[in-house]
Amino acid sequence: MPRRQDIQKILLLGSGPIVIGQACEFDYSGTQACKALREEGYEVVLVNSNPATIMTDPETADRTYIEPLTPELVEKVIARERPDALLPTMGGQTALNIAVALAKNGVLDQYNVELIGAKLPAIEKAEDRKLFNEAMDKIGVKVCPSGTASSLDESKAIARRIGTYPLIIRPAFTMGGTGGGIAYNQEEFEEMAQVGIDASPVSQILIDQSLLGWKEYELEVMRDLADNVVIICSIENIDPMGIHTGDSITVAPAQTLTDKEYQRLRDMAIKIIREIGVETGGSNIQFAVNPVNGDVVVIEMNPRVSRSSALSSKATGFPIAKMAAKLAVGYTLDEIRNDITKKTPASFEPTIDYVVTKVPRFAFEKFPGSEPVLTTQMKSVGEAMAIGRTFNESFQKALRSLETGRAGWGCDKAEKLPSGEQIRAQLRTPNPDRIFAVRHALQLGMSPEEIYELTAIDPWFLDKMQQLLEVEKFLKRTPLKQLTREQMYAVKRDGYSDRQIAFATKTTEDEVRAYRKELGVTPVYKTVDTCAAEFEAFTPYYYSTYEEETEVIPASKPKVMILGGGPNRIGQGIEFDYCCCHAAYALKGAGYETIMVNSNPETVSTDYDTSDRLYFEPLTKEDVLNIIEAENPVGIIVQFGGQTPLKLALPLQDYLRQVGNGSLVIGNGNEETAITDDQLPITKIWGTSPDSIDSAEDRERFEKILQKLNISQPPNGIARSYEDALIVAKRIGYPVVVRPSYVLGGRAMEIVYSDTELERYMTFAVQVEPEHPILIDKFLENAIEVDVDAIADHTGRVVIGGIMEHIEQAGIHSGDSACSLPSISLPPAVLNQIRTWTVQLAQELSVVGLMNIQFAVIGASSYSPQVYILEANPRASRTVPFVSKATGVPLAKLASLIMSGKTLEELNFTQEVIPSHIAVKEAVLPFNKFPGTDTILGPEMRSTGEVMGIDSDFGRAFAKAELGAGERLPLTGTVFVSMSDRDKSAAVPVVREFIDLGFKVMATFGTRRVLLENGLNVELVLKLHEGRPHVIDAIKNQKIQLIINTPSGEEAQTDARLIRRTGLAYKIPIITTIAGAKATVAAIRSMQNTTLDVKTIQEYCPNF
């Protein structure tokens, strides 16, 4: 059937901010869907609150609303735009839940909007656990013994019926297993059941008999209107059931299924998608298989594009989201061409002749108090994927792609083996490092059978790991120079990196590389082509392996290589991927052939049509040098991917200089390209030189530059031991901020108020980076922090991209603080001082491209405000997408063109753009996933994502940002206030404003006394140890609608922490800073006076 002619305008919902369980795979799917629908001539309207997405760029959709994803505001977009159809399957669980809400409350009928991609009955049948089980029963597919409950009493009755613990609890209409878990006894069960009912938007949980130890598989399935069904990919979890699939190491295609078993799953999947009624698009279906008797049960189905669809798309080259969008508007699979082969139709199931491994990345170290144990609730913050010809190769490449300091599956550092008892405990309890515990167990001589008993990891995988250990033993007893060409090939085919070979043979990585090349052992690159080389592939999407024949095709244009950011982690996420994509778009447009190198399957940068060539490879020195030697680019861009490529800049430069041929120099595309002996272009690192980057990162060098320019910074010092630290702290006075040098995301950074706290920090933190000293700065209390993004060209011209004023005071990591652009309270003199220093510093560091500087301002409203510089980063920062959306200036695109030799004048960007509207960025924090952790903000970054609120008034913009971040601010009710002594007097005017807005106020004894002295009528509430009813009772009885609680030093921490955790559990907004409280007052006032309206980014920034 050709495309539908009866619809013209389609509304697409994004997934909002990046949260655990719902990350940038939905930017990838949404961007693909927008492109596909516009190609077909439809007008596309998009709603998404996340500014750090390619999807919200003004050119992706026709009309783009960066507005909170709530049913109320999406209804306003519908009323304004009058779309014919709503496509809800591209924005994860968020979009699906909003679509269901709008269908049920009659909005879609009122405005005559049709749901496409998945109809309401299909969504409900797949998502409502009771309906799903009934549907499976009807078609004879087994489900796990289970029941659905909406109350604690119903839950207990089901537990009695099932009869045995452990039991699995899964809330309906949630993603990433939010609110779920495994209960091993009745007490745990009752607690988890209540949490699960509260977490589900429909207050419903499914209670399953535990299938712990069963094998888990997923099939990615597509169906069209003509009832054609294709299986795109099978995925096998190495970890058994009981661990969320997002936290499990997974392999595609499934490795341990016999053909007969695979056909069984395939037949079931086809029956399921037909019965549920997903007519047009993709679904992800999860199965459990009993390894003892082969029993199969279906676990669940997602009637939408999911995290696994992004992985399947990257693993096979089949663009699921794009195809799903086309199916949603009436095409059938046989009518759509495969983009990669250009010959085969989409109804041909992909075939692959390689193995793909995905490994999750965790961030437990960011959440002290949370246990690093994996369950059915997803906790990973990112993932890396690798492709190899064999499982061993793909597995080792994936582990080194994670960037956690490992070069593969061990054999990369001296290890002290744990005891047998410790290893058994690590194997029994699923945790992020269990795969390395398997290695230790095999090294201690534990049999694969015993490891299987403890882990339920399939013996096939354990056998492969045993083989890897044999290779390692062989390497350790063979001197490097005695390895023959065949042996070197065999070792590399097992995925061993040069660094691992160097460790085993007691040599260096560079020696291994030189000897390997001498033997003529270099990687070749194979194509991901959807058809196992049956047809010619037209899209250069490559992975490395060690065989004879390469499939890299020569190019006629000069090539530029962009190094991506690798797996998402806290501190380095989608914002950097956004910059890499923009570099690819801009340089492609300028006539270069762009090469993207990245290992993250969730992102737009690893879409096969973002760059001209895609290398799905680990971002290590070895892998990147191999690609440089295969492609000979004229330029390499390292300043867009965060810390990952920056760390590679100096090693790449050093190696290429040593090798002779002088084949790497620093510079920009504006010089003449020299030709070396063998007529290949010289490869240059484009943009700011690695030396300048180092002089901004290296504290001592940076301080000299600031002294030369007469720029003030807070009193500070450097310590390499606890004794050093004490001397520095005494000299500059407490409180101080302590942190290791060279970190991103404020890793291991703290504010310290005393000698004892300093001692505790030094004992813990020096282990973080032993070769780098600890930096100690005077902590500027109550300072306003300011972030500046600027851009500079090779002529020395500097233009400010945007000046953002933080809403939380200095001391809270800039990635976790809300901020406003333009500034809302800083006087012109302060802003001008900031501008002057930014320009001077960019010129002194010879910045070419982007730069981010953080300042602190003390006494902004006094007669003599003081400005201090906190740090400077001559690279793209995580605020670039936000600034670009707020001002309408595509900074990353401009910066990449500047690196190619263009000037700001040529690009027509010569002065700062100050918007007439207000944009507020707010951070989104994952505390609900880490129940043991305090919700307090500090200098270590913990947010996973961000949202943007945009309006003509600060109060409304802040209200939208809070709403987008999932905080519904109350308009009436009671505010609970408990302040540290430092903040009590500053709280008086804020509390007065809350009373003026009609709120009642409750406070603890000390805070109340100060408020009463200032003539404010405040009710007393008891602290926990003062008797009942206390503040926690008031929260649980829903007598409090808003909590303002600023943390004090060490004392009373337990009380305050419990108050904050309880507030979080009861979904009460919690504010932990005075500045945040002031912004909240402005937001509530504006919402009491006016309703929130919606407007497109194209209207806010018409010149974008």
Curated annotation (Swiss-Prot):
Mg(2+) 3 binds at residues 854, 871. CDD domains: MGS_CPS_II. ATP 1 binds at residues 129, 170, 176-177, 209, 211, 216, 242-244, 286, 300. Its EC number is 6.3.4.16, 6.3.5.5. Mn(2+) 1 binds at residues 286, 300. Keywords: Amino-acid biosynthesis, Arginine biosynthesis, ATP-binding, Ligase, Magnesium, Manganese, Metal-binding, Nucleotide-binding, Pyrimidine biosynthesis, Repeat. It comes from the Bacteria. InterPro entries: ATP-grasp, CarbamoylP_synth_lsu, CarbamoylP_synth_lsu_oligo, CarbamoylP_synth_lsu_oligo_sf, CbamoylP_synth_lsu-like_ATP-bd, CbamoylP_synth_lsu_CPSase_dom, MGS-like_dom, MGS-like_dom_sf. Residues 967-1104 form the MGS-like domain. Mg(2+) 4 binds at residues 871, 873. Residues 133-329, 703-900 form the ATP-grasp domain. Mg(2+) 1 binds at residues 286, 300. Residues 1-403 are annotated as: Carboxyphosphate synthetic domain. Mn(2+) 2 binds at residues 300, 302. Residues 404-552 are annotated as: Oligomerization domain. Belongs to the CarB family. Large subunit of the glutamine-dependent carbamoyl phosphate synthetase (CPSase). CPSase catalyzes the formation of carbamoyl phosphate from the ammonia moiety of glutamine, carbonate, and phosphate donated by ATP, constituting the first step of 2 biosynthetic pathways, one leading to arginine and/or urea and the other to pyrimidine nucleotides. This is Carbamoyl phosphate synthase large chain. It comes from Nostoc sp. (strain PCC 7120 / SAG 25.82 / UTEX 2576). The gene is carB.
